[in-house]
Amino acid sequence: MSSAPAEPGPSLDRNPPQDIDAEKSVLGAMLSSKDAIADVVEEIKGVDFYRPGHELIFNTITDLYGRGDPADTVTTADALDRRGELERAGGRLYLAELLTNVTVTANAAYYAKIVAEKAVLRRLVEASIRIAQMGYQGQGEVADIVDAAQQTLYDVSTRKTSEEYHPLSELFESTFDELEAIEAPRRAPGGRPPS
């Protein structure tokens, strides 16, 4: 008794999950409103964007916003240009075009959730490929492979990425502590630097 050949699975040459219109709307809203920036950064990170240029724009906007600088098309284009990334991000005209995608800046958080969901789906696809590779390679104990596969899926479900993010308050506190530790030996009793 022979079994019928297996049906081919879904093609891996398909485009990964994405919503470019949502990405453009998020960025356009951020370029239009500080409130939109505050809403969006609660939902997504730069790595959540499908288009690399969008990640560059997002990171530049959030850098400007984090420094208390205005983040509009002019300042964002200038910052990207100083970094040598303006053309990779699409250029000045593309930044202006992003503003045309915005109907209501109040919807920015909703669009950001769409971007976040698509990013999770892309990570799930990537994780499934890694899990399939683990299974095909079959290196190590089966229980260890299963554990690694489960951890891979868990990381996707908790939105972990290769970059670990920490709240700014933690970073500032640890940086301040390090600076104090460096400065302490240089200070003479009485709090003044030695002559």
Go through each PLM region and give its residues:
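Generic structural concept
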Residues: 54, 58, 77, 125-128, ...
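Extended, charged alpha-helical coiled-coil/arm scaffolds that mediate oligomerization and mechanical coupling
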Residues: 92-162
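Alpha-helix boundary/capping detector
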Residues: 52, 83-88, 137-141, 158, ...
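Conserved catalytic-core motifs characterized by acidic clusters
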Residues: 6, 139, 165-168
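Short, flexible helix-adjacent loops and helix caps
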Residues: 42, 69, 136, 161, ...
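Noncatalytic partner-interaction/assembly domains of nucleic-acid and motor enzyme complexes
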Residues: 1-120
